[in-house]
């Protein structure tokens, strides 16, 4: 983090310096000049930049001094430890500058923190390492014997790659009686020899001469080169060819093709015959001119031999000689000026590039580069740009550009940028250079983990195995690297009584949730808790989600018959009058199931009966009713076995055994009472017995029911304090009745004993239930506030 901060600080200093670069350049001093002799070995000392810049060595190292030169060739190297500026390689002045004098290599010195910019130049001093060389080692000069003394004959000059005093200084010729040599200077500064006739020739005495021409340079010691001059003495030819004009000036575009006609020169000779025939040739042509141009010896047409390059040479001075068949010749000069065309694309030199860059740091310097164009004029003017839809901008100072961020970036929206730097010149047609770079964005922890859901509902079937993987929660972080590594944890529950750490656990790495122990629906129907997700950033960011766990009931409880009691005591006998109509309610089997949902949906069916077809059981409520009219032939005692079955998978069941006694003279509740019969002592005694028996049975039944209800309520109260109750949604099937563990008797019945006074006939009257069914309570927040479930059993006996 500390290194990153220093980098950002340094980049901002560079940016600030570039903003002031224009002002600093306006007041900049003259370029600093240094010199070095050519052919000096590489790594040779040039200067100490720290002393030149007035900097201490520590300050020099801190400011990150760099040496930048135009183009991609760097002839100098900087020792950062000693601040010595050294030669990068051995320099050859002739290769670098040719005949240009002085030979100056320009470079720039860049300083950071704050940014400063100095122009400097290195002058390469020539040494005399080249001797004069004649391109033609043998020259033929034809001299008419009629030539008077003082006649001059130009000779082909020698070439010396050195410059200044190391170039050709003068020419000398071997001793003879007729000629001497003069050293002449052309307009471009080059020197050439001219042969001067001192004494008239006589062909009859001497037909030819062989002389040695020597070219000397001004070096110390001087170097020399020689050529042989053959002088042929001719008979009289008294007229030399003359050009139409002594000087030609032409312009030619540098992109002219090979074979292009540059110009046509023309000369005439007043002589006739062979002496009037003229041939043209290049005179005193340098090696470069000889490679570039050719002349038709018959027509005088000058054509291109190779492509021109304005950036290398802007003009050529070509001497043309017109020679007749005799000894005379004429000369003219053709100045060929090369016109620049836009044939060089701009060049981009990258000095510094930074990637990745932090996403939250505006005005960060990304790249520092320079641009150049070898063309001239409008062809060398340059414009630089990048794509408009990018959050970056360019700032320029002379030919240097800085690429920096325009505003804070968002790595989560875009993790990298492909930037194309387009450099265009103003020539026609315009030439374009493009530099592509990819800038990566470094992540900053600015995004908290986000769960895929704000809440999760998990369904776990009771009696699960411990350490069961029940589900996974997942959170993602838009950051990257350690900033996107998510750790999961359980947050403290809002309910302090909830033993969360003993119920579930979470894998911190992948968010897998595990049930630590087996759950019991009858003890805990559901619970909720919060999970947290935090990243590894600095500072760390986090988020949370709600997890609801719903315990699904399993069919692990069989139906329990509340009535009639099945405790092995004396069986309860139901009395049914023989006069009962079909559908007469004999009794009702009441049962409950500790499970819930469809596991608590109960159905009833008659499993066994003493006489089939006499009684029936309603499947949805357990009511036992007569199926037909009773007759005297029907047995008085009947034993019924009722099967109570839940709707679980697999289903569980229980049975209830009923004893039914058919009696005479016992009426239904709404049947008209029979007329009073004569009092009989025996009938009265029987009535008393029946009343006592019925009262005893009813009292015992009521006491058993109350005791059972009290025990169930006590157990339910303890269970309700641990968890919540869940009630299944949807209607019950038509053949089932919901008897979940939170229910007891759904109805209460009244039993009324009616005695027919004086008749001696005893009848029981069964009344309809007077307590309505209560809908099941759906525990939620109300049950959490009250730990006692509304399970009550009520009976009224008259």
Curated annotation (Swiss-Prot):
The entry's localization annotation reads:
Cell membrane
* Cadherin domain: residues covered: 36-134, 139-243, 248-348, 353-451, 456-561, 568-671
Kindly name one Pfam family recorded for this protein: Cadherin
Q: How does it sit in the membrane?
A: Single-pass type I membrane protein
For this UniProt record, give its keywords in alphabetical order, as a comma-separated list: Calcium, Cell adhesion, Cell membrane, Glycoprotein, Membrane, Repeat, Signal, Transmembrane, Transmembrane helix
Query: What Gene Ontology cellular component terms go with this record?
Result: membrane; photoreceptor connecting cilium; photoreceptor disc membrane; plasma membrane; postsynaptic membrane
Cytoplasmic side of membrane: 712-798
Transmembrane stretches in the record are 691-711
Disulphide bond pairs: none
- The lineage's top-level taxon is Eukaryota
Q: Name one GO molecular function term.
A: calcium ion binding
Sugar-bearing residues? Answer: 418, 436, 567
Extracellular face of the membrane: 29-690
Q: Which GO terms describe its biological process?
A: calcium-dependent cell-cell adhesion via plasma membrane cell adhesion molecules; cell adhesion; chemical synaptic transmission; homophilic cell adhesion via plasma membrane adhesion molecules; synapse assembly
Q: Where is the signal peptide?
A: 1-28
Instruction: State what this protein does.
Output: Potential calcium-dependent cell-adhesion protein. May be involved in the establishment and maintenance of specific neuronal connections in the brain.
- What is the protein name for this chain? Protocadherin beta-13
């Amino acid at each position: 983090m500390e290194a990153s901060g220093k980098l950002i600080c340094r980049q901002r200093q560079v940016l600030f310096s570039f903003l002031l670069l224009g002002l600093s350049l306006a007041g900049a001093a003259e370029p600093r000049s240094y010199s070095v002799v050519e052919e000096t070995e590489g790594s040779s000392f040039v200067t100490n930049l720290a002393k030149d810049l007035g900097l201490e060595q520590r300050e020099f190292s801190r400011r990150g001094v760099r040496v930048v030169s135009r183009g991609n060739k760097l002839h100098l190297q900087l020792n950062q430890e000693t601040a010595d500026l050294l030669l990068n390689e051995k320099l050859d002045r002739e290769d670098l500058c040719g005949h240009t004098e002085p030979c100056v290599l320009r470079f720039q010195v860049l300083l950071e923190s704050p940014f400063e910019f100095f122009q400097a130049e290195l002058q390469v001093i020539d040494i005399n390492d080249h001797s004069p060389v004649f391109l033609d080692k043998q020259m033929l000069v034809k001299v008419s014997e009629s030539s008077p003394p003082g006649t001059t004959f130009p000779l082909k000059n020698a070439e010396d790659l050195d410059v200044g005093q190391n170039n050709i200084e003068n020419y000398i010729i071997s001793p003879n009686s007729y000629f001497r040599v003069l050293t002449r200077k052309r307009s471009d500064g080059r020197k050439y020899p001219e042969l001067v006739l001192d004494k008239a020739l006589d062909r009859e005495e001497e037909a030819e001469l062989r002389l040695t021409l020597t070219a000397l340079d001004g070096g110390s010691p001087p170097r020399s080169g020689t050529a042989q001059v053959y002088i042929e003495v001719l008979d009289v030819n008294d007229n030399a060819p003359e050009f139409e004009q002594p000087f030609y000036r032409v312009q030619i575009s540098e992109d002219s093709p090979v074979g292009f006609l540059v110009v046509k020169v023309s000369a005439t000779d007043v002589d006739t015959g062979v002496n009037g025939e003229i041939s043209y040739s290049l005179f005193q042509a340098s090696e470069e001119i000889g490679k570039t141009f050719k002349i038709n010896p018959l027509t005088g047409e000058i054509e291109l031999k190779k492509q021109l390059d304005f950036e290398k040479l802007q003009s050529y001075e070509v001497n043309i000689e017109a020679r007749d068949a005799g000894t005379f010749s004429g000369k003219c000069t053709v100045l060929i000026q090369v016109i620049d065309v836009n044939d060089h694309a701009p060049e981009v030199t990258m000095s510094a590039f930074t990637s990745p860059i932090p996403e939250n740091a505006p005005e960060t310097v990304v790249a520092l580069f320079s641009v150049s164009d070898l063309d001239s004029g409008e062809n060398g003017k340059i414009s630089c740009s990048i794509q408009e839809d990018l959050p970056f901008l360019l700032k320029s100072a002379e030919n240097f550009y800085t690429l920096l961020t325009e505003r804070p970036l968002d790595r989560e929206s875009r993790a990298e940028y492909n930037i194309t730097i387009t450099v265009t010149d103003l020539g026609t047609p315009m030439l374009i250079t493009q530099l592509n770079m990819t800038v990566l964005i470094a992540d900053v922890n600015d995004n908290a983990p986000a769960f895929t859901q704000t809440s999760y509902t998990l369904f776990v079937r009771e009696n699960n195995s411990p350490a069961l993987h029940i589900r996974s929660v997942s959170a993602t972080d838009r950051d990257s690297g350690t900033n996107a590594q998510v750790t999961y944890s359980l947050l403290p529950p809002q309910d302090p009584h909830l033993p969360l750490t003993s119920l579930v656990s979470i894998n911190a790495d992948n968010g897998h949730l595990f049930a630590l122990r087996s759950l019991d629906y009858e003890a805990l129907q559901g619970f909720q808790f919060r999970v947290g997700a935090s990243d590894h950033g600095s500072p760390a960011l986090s988020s949370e989600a709600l997890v609801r766990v719903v315990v699904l009931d399993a069919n692990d409880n069989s139906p329990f018959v509340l009535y009639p009691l099945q405790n092995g005591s004396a069986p309860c006998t139901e009395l049914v009058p023989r006069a009962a109509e079909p559908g007469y309610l004999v009794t009702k089997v009441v049962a409950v199931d500790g499970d819930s949902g469809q596991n608590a949906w109960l159905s009833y069916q008659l499993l066994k009966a003493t006489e089939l077809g006499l009684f029936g059981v309603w499947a949805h409520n357990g009511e036992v009713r007569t199926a037909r009219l009773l007759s005297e032939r029907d047995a008085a005692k009947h034993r019924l076995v009722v099967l109570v079955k839940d709707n679980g998978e697999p289903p569980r069941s229980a049975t209830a055994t009923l004893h039914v006694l058919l009696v005479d003279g016992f009426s239904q509740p709404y049947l008209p009472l029979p007329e009073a019969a004569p009092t009989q002592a025996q009938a009265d005694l029987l009535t008393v017995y029946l009343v006592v028996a019925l009262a005893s049975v009813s009292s015992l039944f009521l006491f058993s029911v109350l005791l059972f209800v009290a025990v169930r309520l006590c157990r339910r109260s303890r269970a309700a304090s641990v968890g919540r109750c869940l009630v299944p949604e949807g209607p019950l099937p038509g053949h089932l009745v919901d008897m979940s563990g939170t229910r007891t008797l759904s109805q209460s019945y009244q039993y009324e004993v009616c005695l027919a006074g004086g008749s001696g006939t005893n009848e029981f009257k069964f009344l309809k239930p007077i307590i309505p069914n209560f809908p099941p309570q759906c525990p939620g927040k109300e049950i959490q506030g009250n730990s006692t479930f509304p399970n009550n059993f009520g009976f009224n006996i008259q």
